Amino acid sequence: MICQKFCVVLLHWEFIYVITAFNLSYPITPWRFKLSCMPPNSTYDYFLLPAGLSKNTSNSNGHYETAVEPKFNSSGTHFSNLSKTTFHCCFRSEQDRNCSLCADNIEGKTFVSTVNSLVFQQIDANWNIQCWLKGDLKLFICYVESLFKNLFRNYNYKVHLLYVLPEVLEDSPLVPQKGSFQMVHCNCSVHECCECLVPVPTAKLNDTLLMCLKITSGGVIFQSPLMSVQPINMVKPDPPLGLHMEITDDGNLKISWSSPPLVPFPLQYQVKYSENSTTVIREADKIVSATSLLVDSILPGSSYEVQVRGKRLDGPGIWSDWSTPRVFTTQDVIYFPPKILTSVGSNVSFHCIYKKENKIVPSKEIVWWMNLAEKIPQSQYDVVSDHVSKVTFFNLNETKPRGKFTYDAVYCCNEHECHHRYAELYVIDVNINISCETDGYLTKMTCRWSTSTIQSLAESTLQLRYHRSSLYCSDIPSIHPISEPKDCYLQSDGFYECIFQPIFLLSGYTMWIRINHSLGSLDSPPTCVLPDSVVKPLPPSSVKAEITINIGLLKISWEKPVFPENNLQFQIRYGLSGKEVQWKMYEVYDAKSKSVSLPVPDLCAVYAVQVRCKRLDGLGYWSNWSNPAYTVVMDIKVPMRGPEFWRIINGDTMKKEKNVTLLWKPLMKNDSLCSVQRYVINHHTSCNGTWSEDVGNHTKFTFLWTEQAHTVTVLAINSIGASVANFNLTFSWPMSKVNIVQSLSAYPLNSSCVIVSWILSPSDYKLMYFIIEWKNLNEDGEIKWLRISSSVKKYYIHDHFIPIEKYQFSLYPIFMEGVGKPKIINSFTQDDIEKHQSDAGLYVIVPVIISSSILLLGTLLISHQRMKKLFWEDVPNPKNCSWAQGLNFQKPETFEHLFIKHTASVTCGPLLLEPETISEDISVDTSWKNKDEMMPTTVVSLLSTTDLEKGSVCISDQFNSVNFSEAEGTEVTYEDESQRQPFVKYATLISNSKPSETGEEQGLINSSVTKCFSSKNSPLKDSFSNSSWEIEAQAFFILSDQHPNIISPHLTFSEGLDELLKLEGNFPEENNDKKSIYYLGVTSIKKRESGVLLTDKSRVSCPFPAPCLFTDIRVLQDSCSHFVENNINLGTSSKKTFASYMPQFQTCSTQTHKIMENKMCDLTV
């Protein structure tokens, strides 16, 4: 008992002693602290000096150094004969100026430093110490830096760290002794900076670690007091990783990073960044607990430099090192968001800040474009701030890929100038159809979906997500915030397939497809599926098919599947068995029905039958078709009829006994229903003899005909019975002499068809049918025969016929009383053969002739085109020339005008570029003052007009005098045997007269025009009353060759001249010898009085009376037509006059009172 109490007291004392020892240790702080060893009798101020130097000792670089060169005993480490000086070593933090724990010579010399030099009796030693646990949580590091940079440089400077692990302390009953410490060597650099590494097990991170430092230099040893630390409280994390910056959708700069790995607790982060732009320079330092930081008010063209470090969020810890600096520069145009991924039908918005030439563009001046091809309406713009513009797109359509671009480019522009940067808009149709079906055992549900209907994006993934409700589906499916993913696998048909197992039949599964992309995620419209409503039942079982006996219906039976328990409807398909079955469908809506009978056309065929089912209420899917069931061919009924048969009679015609061989063809299945086991022949003679003979399966039978009349019947018998409807054939001696066939003809169409026709005579016997029989006379082949209706008079026999062979055709009339006398021919009808042969030759010759004609015509056309191309390739089309506009090349007069050689000599002149008609500017002032002046008849016709009813006055006193008057309604007559209408030709001439001369020229026009035509309905008044006629001096010429009945058209110059040119040359040949064509000659002023007018035929000179006809004729240009200079006669040809079409070969040197530049011109009409 006493021993037990002693042990308890001892243990309690040891525990108190150990606690006391821990309380004597210095708790290591997360920040840096200092170890100072002070010589005895040193004051506090002296102790605060770095390295214990005197107050007046310093050097130029700021470091304190001793003024006394230390004299160490380098002979060894024997301290027995040396004087011993005790240094007091203690720890103090940078914030605390007092020593928190000193090392005295207590309990031995563990914390006592000894020196053998007088140098350390005047100075002290100081070290900076910082300890931390490395980010990988495996090494505890203490960093020891001497504050004397040169004190220990030339001596053996060593630092050791002594530590004791927690498990060692548990085994020791006393305060840790020197032998219980483990020692690690610290790696020191040349600058007296040492790093000590202590391995710490992961399981001991929360335990207390005891340490002390032992510093040796030469013969001096410094030892620190005990230090205690919990490694988990001294963790120094690794710097944050993945520093990244981007502009958010809201226009902020987002700084994001990742936490360092293997950190057992959350961290806080310190972010420092600087912004440098043309307008703002700022720095910031913020501490956050998240792994991101938003910086607002960013500006285009700015540079941001960012660094981040981390530290334990709750509890003590050490800041990590700063991360590597990251620089981010904004562009001159900032889009936020820069990219948008959205679905069809949604509304999205882009924001923009535009910087141009170091100035931010006001938001009101920003315009938006789509793909640089479509300007977005201003109604979609919004001004967010002075510099931020916003555009919104409504009800978006799917983006159409353009080559490798799968997005629309949205440009932010300043008026009409756009920056090359743009925002990207991705619009995807996410309408994905998800279909599910529950298997027939109600144990699993399979869902399928395809992405073929949506546009695929690079680096995008698709995932099916679902949410299961407790019971049924909601009326409007919606995406639930809590959902689960489902693994789906791509199948060979391009569909993804997902399997839900187990399932809850009455739970609603809401599903949607989520498209995950770096730009965001999109969800397809959700759909809700109830497994019980999408059941695909098992196919019906025990399906059988058969043809019922004596009824002849297709009977189909089946068994309902076990699941589901709902009422089912059934669908049956059946058809003739073969490679490609032509199915017929039949629906059965009676849930209790298990069989059905259907009519089929062919009772003797094999039918394939399949059945499937579905819920009667329409929910779910049709099951798969059952395995096919086949009918078995068997006799259903007795044969529908007996076989058709014919006979061959052999024997002496003089005798009454003949051998008759019956021939028949085997019955088909449709007639035998469905097989024939044997044939039976019934005999009936005129002596009432009746008997039957079984011939088995043979199709030939011979019997002896001895009676006057013998009737035979062939019956077909199957497993059901004998045929009911049978054919009878009576052999009668009297009837064999009845002849009703007058003629028989056989016409071969080709080698496979012969037409047989016949003519019958009237008969009192009832004709039943005909038998046509034919055979090749050159061969011993069998006789072929056909049964033909009695109403037919012509029949086509289809067989293989050889034209050079002879064939015998026989036609037998069959009566109720017996077989009549046949009509037999031994060859084809000759006349018809020749006709058909000639027709056949015609059939060959005509196509040959037609083909040859077509080939010859094609050859001629090709040759014509080649010849035309060869000879006329370089000849231009005259209709495309300006001088040929309006000319009718269908008339020979046109070509004579074009190509008759000019009789007068032509002088050379400068060549015009285009052969166009250039009218001359001639002013004409005409009047007849003397009414008594007489004018030749030819001149009368020259000035006659055609508007007799509207009052155009140019002529009075029929054929007696000519007078220009302003009176209206004067009658003009014109005698012409052919009543040919005169033709009025005129030309308008445009001048370049100066404005000062306009009045004079206009007066000339008015005086000349208005005196000849009435002011009311003149045919040329409209042309002269407007446009340039009132501004420039112009003139017109009239040539009379028009019928009196034609009304002169009211046209402008350009229209009227075209119309008149179309009528040019319409001079009937038969009237040329009766009527002359008159032309107006224009001459210069000097030759005006001697001017004459020549007719085409009479060659009579008709002088123009100057005072009565033309009072003034002035040529206003220096150049004019050749005939103006030399002669007033236009055309001296003995046949016909002509108008030159090439004005560049006509010159004129006539001098007038108005001289202008020399020009080529032509006065033609």
Curated annotation (Swiss-Prot):
Required for STAT3 phosphorylation: annotated segments: 898-906
Topological type in the membrane: Single-pass type I membrane protein
Official protein name in the record: Leptin receptor
Function: Receptor for hormone LEP/leptin. On ligand binding, mediates LEP central and peripheral effects through the activation of different signaling pathways such as JAK2/STAT3 and MAPK cascade/FOS. In the hypothalamus, LEP acts as an appetite-regulating factor that induces a decrease in food intake and an increase in energy consumption by inducing anorexinogenic factors and suppressing orexigenic neuropeptides, also regulates bone mass and secretion of hypothalamo-pituitary-adrenal hormones.
Keywords of the record: Cell membrane, Disulfide bond, Glycoprotein, Immunoglobulin domain, Membrane, Obesity, Phosphoprotein, Receptor, Repeat, Secreted, Signal, Transmembrane, Transmembrane helix
Residue stretches spanning the membrane: 840-862
Annotated ranges, domain Ig-like: 331-429
Region span, Leptin-binding: 467-484
Subunit structure: Present as a mixture of monomers and dimers. The phosphorylated receptor binds a number of SH2 domain-containing proteins such as JAK2, STAT3, PTPN11, and SOCS3. Interaction with SOCS3 inhibits JAK/STAT signaling and MAPK cascade.
Reported effect, C604G: In LEPRD; uncertain significance
Extracellular topological domain: 22-839
Disease: Leptin receptor deficiency: A rare disease characterized by normal levels of serum leptin, hyperphagia and severe obesity from an early age. Additional features include alterations in immune function, and delayed puberty due to hypogonadotropic hypogonadism.
Residue span of region Required for JAK2 activation: 893-898
Example of a GO biological process term: phagocytosis
Modified residues (Phosphoserine): S882
Predominant cellular place of this UniProt entry's protein: membrane
Pfam families, alphabetized: fn3 (PF00041), Lep_receptor_Ig (PF06328), ObR_Ig (PF18589)
Tissue: Isoform A is expressed in fetal liver and in hematopoietic tissues and choroid plexus. In adults highest expression in heart, liver, small intestine, prostate and ovary. Low level in lung and kidney. Isoform B is highly expressed in hypothalamus, but also in skeletal muscle. Detected in fundic and antral epithelial cells of the gastric mucosa. Isoform B and isoform A are expressed by NK cells (at protein level).
